[in-house]
Amino acid sequence: MDLRASLVLITSYLFFSVAKACSNGDCKLLDPCSSNGDCQAGLYCFSCPLEFSGSRCVRSTTTNQFKLLNNTLPFNKYAFLTTHNAYAIEGEPSHTGVPRVTFTNQEDNVTRQLNEPAIDTLKEIEAFLSANPTEIVTVILEDYVQAPNGLTKVFTDAGLMKYWFPLKNMPKNGQDWPLVSDMVANNQRLLVFTSIRSKEESEGIAYQWNYMVENRYGDGGMHAGNCPNRAESSPLNDRTKSLVLVNYFPTIPFKQIACEHNSANLINMLHTCFGAAGNRWANFVAVDFYKRSDGGGAFQALDTLNGKLLCGCDDVHACVNGSTSLACNNDINVDHS
């Protein structure tokens, strides 16, 4: 066999090996792919030109920290993924008869984000809570409802009051929240916060800034190494508020660069805000286009937060079940399903 024939054979073999590297649900995280069906459970096929060429399998689901470890700790000892302006769904028409004056910054409907009238969205939340009796949903409202008891009425009409977490059980002086297991057992699985102070007294709806601190949202909150508090919030290191919310999204959402934002830069900001919050890890992390990333994305950021909160490890999968101290299993095999 001459040299040319050998090179042709070698080239053909290499092409065949690469083309057949994985398919039919066998492709792992960051493996090249051509369709969602190529990727393992918990992954999907996505292109992020800013970080890699072609398409690769990236994460599409969160880790259920309650199932992986336990739900026996206070609510503020866990972290949760938060979708910024969850109603602003690409391709979703307005249901109010007037155009929606906002940027779209999510691609999945509310049901997918959890598993335009307010009633439609709230009914989706009710359906989710009904179908998932061990799950907890937190709603943080930028509240523009002016009608007296208008917000209470829409939650009542959506059938959500049976899940309502009562105001009297919310700690105001930095104490721990009730145990998640107790919240589930008592079916108090819906936490609602409003941005209007008076509604805490008039409607029994928690005023957000009495219970949590929050960093600045938009471009002002995305400068590396700096985590300023939102204007309405107490300073991030105010320990009389036992919940911490970290925003990481630009003022104007741009989905083509969201995959870069929702990756290493996001995790770096969580570490920065940890210091700014008096060495407290975030309980909520809010992003745009939450499924877009260059690999683990917002889901890996959440695994990092829960690892830090629950056992001091860099990944929740490294936590030794039953331990609440620095007991890390560094030989981890992550199942993203």
Question: Residue spans of the language-model regions?
Answer:
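Catalytic cores of phosphodiester-bond hydrolases, prominently lipid phosphodiesterases
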Residues: 2-336
